[in-house]
């Protein structure tokens, strides 16, 4: 009977990404795993799925399969010669011939669990001053029923029926050399050489279960947007007794209504009147912890910037504080009473300025236009 197309076996199209292929394999292997599915033909289906994934998950093998299919090249290398072929799969083939397989990772060796990531949104104040927050996160934890063993309590393990305890299986592969036989880790026992007499009813043999876990996170004083902290050992459980992975909490900081932040420095925009700019003044302004009085010298112009040293954010690594910069904007009045206008005209005359007064009122401008003023 002819072999089915590997893409068809996994139920994905030929342009599927590696993640899509992996997701399809996990779903199907779980469905047809001999320890879970006792229906006739499930074992063969599981082998077919494993073989398809073994090829499509490897870039070189997938490229060879896409080019030659199941049969591989016939009658040598054809008109392309050696220069026109992709020999990316040779390393895998030769390693199986000359002992390269011994360098493969031991499937029974302890392995660290996967690292996880969690995004936490915090306020500007929480980032500046630091705080403690509780989060809820769904993650894999060690199964409480089997304690991570994967077997039903009270049952034992037996020799894997798929690899007969070898931990590895022989698989035929299509390559540019034709069909070659190589070894791979047994997909059923994952190299242990044993299988469950009866899998754990809670985790179905995985050794882990998905639960919502509450954790307390310390937000460091001075943390900035996109920075992260590591919670050691709060990731996924390890494999074969390996350590847990870590949890990385990434911070998203909401903007402040008062300040703008750039690293450890903060900026405050201060509007002052024409009189304050011309005569100078003392103005109370906010800082991160309290209000302070800022002296505005006479003749201050728009764009003037004042620096308040060490009034910025504390550096998250403990390297001092940033600065507070105050940006000045002189605001021109939009409405003047008659007395204010008289004073400004007098001021202009003293300066020798010939002012052609303009009105912001449409009716006044219209009257002046028709009078020819």
UniProtKB/Swiss-Prot annotation:
Subcellular location as annotated: Cytoplasm
Binding site for Zn(2+) 2: 160, 163, 186, 189
Cofactor (UniProt): Zn(2+)
Coiled coil: none
A biological-process GO annotation: response to heat
Keyword tags: Chaperone, Cytoplasm, DNA replication, Metal-binding, Repeat, Stress response, Zinc, Zinc-finger
Cofactor-binding details, from the entry: Binds 2 Zn(2+) ions per monomer.
Residues the record lists as binding Zn(2+) 1: 143, 146, 200, 203
UniProt key word Metal-binding: yes
Main subcellular localisation: cytoplasm
UniProt domain J: residue ranges: 5-69
InterPro entries: DnaJ, DnaJ_C, DnaJ_domain, DnaJ_domain_CS, HSP40/DnaJ_pept-bd, HSP_DnaJ_Cys-rich_dom, HSP_DnaJ_Cys-rich_dom_sf, J_dom_sf
GO molecular function: ATP binding; heat shock protein binding; unfolded protein binding; zinc ion binding
GO-annotated cellular components: cytoplasm
CXXCXGXG motif repeats: 143-150, 160-167, 186-193, 200-207
Chain ranges of zinc fingers (CR-type): 130-212
Subunit structure: Homodimer.
Role summary: Participates actively in the response to hyperosmotic and heat shock by preventing the aggregation of stress-denatured proteins and by disaggregating proteins, also in an autonomous, DnaK-independent fashion. Unfolded proteins bind initially to DnaJ; upon interaction with the DnaJ-bound protein, DnaK hydrolyzes its bound ATP, resulting in the formation of a stable complex. GrpE releases ADP from DnaK; ATP binding to DnaK triggers the release of the substrate protein, thus completing the reaction cycle.
Family: Belongs to the DnaJ family.
Comment field on protein domains: The J domain is necessary and sufficient to stimulate DnaK ATPase activity. Zinc center 1 plays an important role in the autonomous, DnaK-independent chaperone activity of DnaJ. Zinc center 2 is essential for interaction with DnaK and for DnaJ activity.
Protein name, per record: Chaperone protein DnaJ
Organism: Staphylococcus epidermidis (strain ATCC 12228 / FDA PCI 1200)
Gene encoding the protein: dnaJ
